Amino acid sequence: REVVREAIMLDRSETGVRLRCRSRTPFPDKVRLRAPRLGLDIMARTVWQTGFDTGLAFEM
């Protein structure tokens, strides 16, 4: 089952991203990150969550 969450990408590097969501609902361990305008469609793992912010590491 796919769940879609909108978020603001606060920071991006070669290895991952920092996102800010509207809710504090925990992310699953693994997610598919899609941002078509940025050319991103990649699997990532949740590394940390604090409040509304989440850090994801790209699966290389």
Explain the meaning of each model-derived region.
Residues R1-M60:
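Structured alpha-helical
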